[in-house]
Amino acid sequence: MNEQYSALRSNVSMLGKVLGETIKDALGEHILDRVETIRKLSKSSRAGNEANRQELLTTLQNLSNDELLPVARAFSQFLNLANTAEQYHSISPKGEAASNPEVIARTLRKLKNQPDLNDATIKKAVESLSLELVLTAHPTEITRRTLIHKMGEINNCLKQLDNTDIADYERHQVMRRLRQLIAQSWHTDEIRKQRPSPVDEAKWGFAVVENSLWQGVPNYLRELNEQLEENLGYKLPVDFVPVRFTSWMGGDRDGNPNVTADITRHVLLLSRWKATDLFLKDIHVLVSELSMVDATPELLALVGEEGASEPYRYLMKKLRARLMATQSWLEARLKGEKLPKPAGLLTQNEQLWEPLYACYQSLQACGMGIIANGELLDTLRRVKCFGVPLVRIDIRQESTRHTEALGEITRYLGIGDYESWSEADKQAFLIRELNSKRPLLPRNWEPSNDTREVLETCKVIAEAPKGSIAAYVISMAKTPSDVLAVHLLLKEAGIGFAMPVAPLFETLDDLNNADDVMTQLLNIDWYRGLIQGKQMVMIGYSDSAKDAGVMAASWAQYQAQDALIKTCEKAGIELTLFHGRGGSIGRGGAPAHAALLSQPPGSLKGGLRVTEQGEMIRFKYGLPEVTVSSLSLYTSAILEANLLPPPEPKDSWRHIMDELSVISCETYRGYVRENKDFVPYFRSATPEQELGKLPLGSRPAKRRPTGGVESLRAIPWIFAWTQNRLMLPAWLGAGTALQKVVEDGKQSELEAMCRDWPFFSTRLGMLEMVFSKADLWLADYYDQRLVAKTLWPLGKELRDLLEEDIKVVLAIANDSHLMADLPWIAESIQLRNVYTDPLNVLQAELLYRSRLTEEQGKSPDPRVEQALMVTIAGVAAGMRNTG
């Protein structure tokens, strides 16, 4: 174990040293000395030296306005470098073995050792594997794209330095490159000046595909194939690609007025353009490589006399010409030019697949399998995974927008006000219209801008090439009419196929009613006919946790999934559960393997569809090797969950969870909703108001411009509490509930649940992770520096609660310290704390100065404002997640 850490620590130390030299060259010895003094004080403070802790506070409080930014940047950049080293460590030969693709081999061996599983059953489970990762542009990716690129280059340098055979002169060159990259990062502004537009966000998503997934996916499939061949004697079929990617970037308009129908249309074109660009690079390589002459009669017939001398090249050149013509047409469309479609325009995956697969079959038949299974196989697999659209997009819109649009239509037609009708009347009207042959929308009618936007979006879906839009997600779905309304609006737009429409249940009440809503829908004959035996339902993690606290939300999510699985099974419907998880614990984030195995039995039968949000995309897919690792973990978890499902919880365990849920929800809401001091405390103890100044995502922080905590989106809500290290949304209520159940004499039952029920042990594990990142003295310091004395008792009460919660969780888990079973993560948090602590102290000081300036009616000092933004980015890097 220690060997693993020493490799990581020596890389972190080496990168820190280079950063120190860079700072000295840029700003002089005195700034580096100041940074080093603060670092040493922080280390000593962490080790428990109270005098040094006080000195740390005094030193940071006394920094001049000119010193603020360099000090903030030094610690922030160090944390980015530490994260880069850690990401490399997770895939390096000296790193944590669990992250390597070996995880698939371990799972296959485990499955083979089960007496009631045979190879045929395992093979069948592999063939039904389905993994869809939905990339979302949540404003949590705080790091600029230009810096992410440099971090990737630094990773490559670490890889080269890890090579034991590296010659001295090569090592010298790599170190020089490393110094250049760290200097470039230091001299780059880490805070972007403008908010990204939805198109910028989409381009960020395409960059992830190009820089990592494009190579990572074929590498993962090669790895999976090798492990299956070795363990089961089974080869993956060429056309079997169990993973695909969808994006919300450019499609998610929930609460984001910047995502319009025109934006979605533009992003769809841009996505196709990027696909042609990437496939052109692949075909260019194949034109060069496939110089072979031997071919099957079928291939020779396909190329004719003209291509007989180099049949493979001939086909590849023809495909290249089609790709180039398609790209030119898409470029013109993106510029707003209306051109007729050229002959041979590529719109369907089959058009790419057929010539490539013809070459593949011919090479195999002519004894050149080794060539067929090289670059050509990788390209074929990319066609299956990415294809002509590159990434499909989801459309997401809030349910009330559809209700308002239909209300406007019915009022204009003089048939009443749809918005005020009962649920039964709405359903009767919708089913009647869905069965009707005549259009509902009147001609020459001028709708309001909001309604026009909803209708235009439906038109974009109807016009988009088939397969480029994956699903229509309805956020804040509450009733069957919410789902039927979308189907009617799509029908009116002229959609010619059954678009998957997924209701998103995201508050406590909506999760509790989810099964009832879906049962009603499945009892409608028209609806059953439309969905053809398939239904997608999205489970919201972030908003339910914000509404009721993590304990109540996670139990409601579990029960909703459990009920939906059973209802759909009974009705003969294939259910796909779509998990809207965030990166942070308060938004449903958890280590993938543990999270998947803790779900109700049968929840992954229809495959896994899950959001990958903001900064988690970079941590899990930022490099091809990390992509292989992440996809391997998902694959092994899905196989294990489907073949060795977790046990059904005992009735007594369910009763305890009901109890925990009620107590934790009451506690959570008692503070967040009912305590009159809570909102003023939240606003002053965290940088919530200042977060709005950060140009993070294209989406506003609030659903409505006014209003309290309830109108805040889940992300800024979590982000703010992560910054001041109280981490409140991720634990409030949970420990109080556990303590009450322990006091009722049920500790042994809780211990059994922790031992034998993955759902419960994962909940406790997530709490331990949060507790490891929370910090009582820092949260206290924010109070001392920023909060009115009248609110101090509330802060103390919350910190005391946190302390009690830690004790009760350790008692149930039978551990003496946090994260005892995940020492690697505990070590990683400790490593970063030394650098995050000064940023937290500095942030509290900067918030104090910034607010004082505002109170005095003076204009803000740009040095203070800029340094504040840097500390926010730095703490986010230290915590490894933002919201």
From Swiss-Prot:
It is an enzyme of class 4 (lyase). Its EC number is 4.1.1.31. Keywords: Allosteric enzyme, Carbon dioxide fixation, Lyase, Magnesium. Its cofactor is Mg(2+). The enzyme has distinct binding sites for each of the allosteric effectors such as acetyl-CoA, fructose 1,6-bisphosphate, guanosine 3'-diphosphate 5'-diphosphate, long chain fatty acids, and L-aspartate. One of its GO terms (cellular component) is cytosol. GO terms for biological process: carbon fixation; oxaloacetate metabolic process; tricarboxylic acid cycle. Homotetramer. This is Phosphoenolpyruvate carboxylase. The lineage of its organism: Bacteria, Pseudomonadati, Pseudomonadota, Gammaproteobacteria, Enterobacterales. The gene is ppc.
